[in-house]
Every structure is written in C-alpha cells, then in structure tokens.
Amino acid sequence: MNKRRVKMRKEIRLSGFGGQGIILAGVILGRAAALYDNKEAVQTQSYGPEARGGASKSEVVISDEPIDFPKVIKPDILVCLSQQAYDKYKDDIKEGGVVLVDEDLVSTDKMPEVDVTMYKIPFTRIASEEIKLPIVANIVMLGALTRLTNIVSKESMEKAILDSVPKGTEEKNLLAFSKGYEVAKEL
C-alpha cells in the first residue's frame, strides 16, 4: 500500500508598528527554518511610509516542500504587538490557529471570529524590566513563539538570532529569547 505523506505548510504573520523589530523577527524565523531546520521558508514584509510608529508586518511561510505561493493567505499563527495590528488581522486567522499578543499593548476584548488558542504575554515589559532593553521585545516574542508552536527548534532559533542581530548584542538577545521561551513554559 502506498502511503501519502501529509504536507506541512505553516503560515505565520508577525505584526505591530515600526521600531518594534517585526521585520527582523520575521527574517530570524525564516532563517531558523531554512538554514538550520532544513525546511523551506519564504519571508515577505510590508510597512507604512513612516520610519517608526507606522504599521509593520512580516509574513513567513514554512513548509517541508517547495513553496508554490509565498504569501500568507490565512495565518496558522498570528502575533500582534500593537492594537492596530490586532484589530486589522485578528479575523484573518485560521480556525484552530494560535494568536500571541503583547498583553500590555493589545486589548483582546474583541476576539477573532473563529476558535483560536490565545496567549497574552507581556513581551515589552519582560524586555524592559528583566533585560533592561525594551528593543529586544521582538526576541522575547520569538522565544515564546518557539516554545508554544514548535514551528522551529530552539537550537535553530538561537543560531539564527546569533546570525542576525548586531554584533555586540548577541548576549542580550539570547537572554531575551531565553526569557520568552521560559515564560511560555508556564502557560
């Protein structure tokens, strides 16, 4: 009997506003999948005309086969680090998807139209209070995302972070990743 292998295609949308490192987070996620987990990955991005404060979105498609369409249609995983992003994208998520929000920046009074698993984590507060560096909230988020979804391995993400962050910031970024990973263990 010939068994058909089930294809794995996961669509991830990371969203927030300019200056939060959304694009870098998408690049790191795609790099972890493609270079270190030996998966296929495509990363696309869009942002408003403002350098900081405007809407920002990074989408990553991860698959175990060649990716025939590089855009996210219905995300399996949605991350929102701003209220504007949550309000705009919450109803795009797939039934049974996973939503992560920064609980200090996003009110989830209005839930997505479909059943999802919602995680509310204070990414920015963890970065500010525990690492003393608010700019690494995106890396805290990647730690939680990795732990909660297993979309890529922890080791692959750590390698991709080291490849991607500015020289001299590696230790703080790995600490941020570790904090996010640990806080997700408690959920």
From Swiss-Prot:
PANTHER family to which the protein is assigned, alphabetical: 2-OXOGLUTARATE SYNTHASE SUBUNIT KORC
Keywords for this protein: Oxidoreductase
Recorded GO MF terms: 2-oxoglutarate synthase activity
Q: Report the protein name in the record.
A: 2-oxoglutarate synthase subunit KorC
Q: How does it assemble?
A: Heterotetramer of the KorA, KorB, KorC and KorD subunits.
Q: What is its EC number?
A: 1.2.7.3
> Which domain of life does the protein's organism represent?
Archaea
Task: Write down the SUPFAM superfamilies for this protein, in alphabetical order.
Answer: Pyruvate-ferredoxin oxidoreductase, PFOR, domain III
Catalytic class of the enzyme: oxidoreductase
InterPro entries from the entry? Answer: 2-oxoglutarate_synth_KorC, PorC_KorC, Pyrv/ketoisovalerate_OxRed_cat, Pyrv_flavodox_OxRed_cen
What does the record give as the reaction this protein catalyses?
2 oxidized [2Fe-2S]-[ferredoxin] + 2-oxoglutarate + CoA = succinyl-CoA + 2 reduced [2Fe-2S]-[ferredoxin] + CO2 + H(+)
Q: Which organism is it from?
A: Methanocaldococcus jannaschii (strain ATCC 43067 / DSM 2661 / JAL-1 / JCM 10045 / NBRC 100440)
